[in-house]
Amino acid sequence: MKAIIVKPPNAGVQVKDVDEKKLDSYGKIKIRTIYNGICGTDREIVNGKLTLSTLPKGKDFLVLGHEAIGVVEESYHGFSQGDLVMPVNRRGCGICRNCLVGRPDFCETGEFGEAGIHKMDGFMREWWYDDPKYLVKIPKSIEDIGILAQPLADIEKSIEEILEVQKRVPVWTCDDGTLNCRKVLVVGTGPIGVLFTLLFRTYGLEVWMANRREPTEVEQTVIEETKTNYYNSSNGYDKLKDSVGKFDVIIDATGADVNILGNVIPLLGRNGVLGLFGFSTSGSVPLDYKTLQEIVHTNKTIIGLVNGQKPHFQQAVVHLASWKTLYPKAAKMLITKTVSINDEKELLKVLREKEHGEIKIRILWE
């Protein structure tokens, strides 16, 4: 079958025919691939920059792709022929308690597999076989934006985790019982920053997006339709602090030099949460004893945010459907481009490089 393969830790990517018998199979349901999503993780693997990416045992290549929508070929165990489905990409170690109850996002051994990334073949191939417990149904009404359910699942889990952490505060809701008075700063306005903004606004929190430039057309649409605030941070964050004050939640969605944290930690308010989502690959954070004392004395929390599981995929499906009503203009702009699997030149280009203003590029299997 045709597949997109990589050979981590080496850079490079190929579209080639491979022997199906040499590829990982995960169950009995045959799924024909319709769409794959491309994200920063894929590009880091393609460009040889993701050090945690490893080959499946005994193999010299890895099928790329952890974002996919496919169609069920034969009815089986609650799934009907023709159903659209999305696979959950992280699979448990089979040892620790969290993995045994379907939560490998909290794997205690670190021996989990991640399709298309770590130890498991991914879904950038013509078809694959899977287990029902790792499949989420995608309504045909959101087929146009459904590929976003995978990255959105990670954001669903992240916000769920933040809200769970904030239960440590006796009262974190506002005087009307909502979260409408809580302020969030989302640093970084790429695909992840946009999804964080949309979901925080859906929950009712007040949001500021920040980047070192003016917003793109897509970002401007999100800002206007969700009534989000925007701050150009090219000259630092002093003006934001003076005009808005401190924030209840700060999200680092930049994936940029980690030095950015030194600029935003002073913006975090009492009892606040700093959520780290982006994977920085350079820099260091200057933390003196006074900053650490303040973190302790004012009950601040710093938390790593990663990987949604099946419940979060299901929540993502619901929210994507709701955004087509709540934020219809933004929803229509979330898929930046669709590239045919048969257009190899363009395909290899988008697998290597992010396009300006990109939210999500998807591959169409024809």
From Swiss-Prot:
The keyword NADP applies. Binds 2 Zn(2+) ions per subunit. One of the zinc atoms is essential for catalytic activity while the other has a structural function. Its cofactor is Zn(2+). It catalyses: D-glucose + NAD(+) = D-glucono-1,5-lactone + NADH + H(+); D-glucose + NADP(+) = D-glucono-1,5-lactone + NADPH + H(+); D-galactose + NAD(+) = D-galactono-1,4-lactone + NADH + H(+); D-galactose + NADP(+) = D-galactono-1,5-lactone + NADPH + H(+). It holds the Pfam family Glu_dehyd_C. Homotetramer. HAMAP family: Glucose_DH. This is Glucose 1-dehydrogenase.
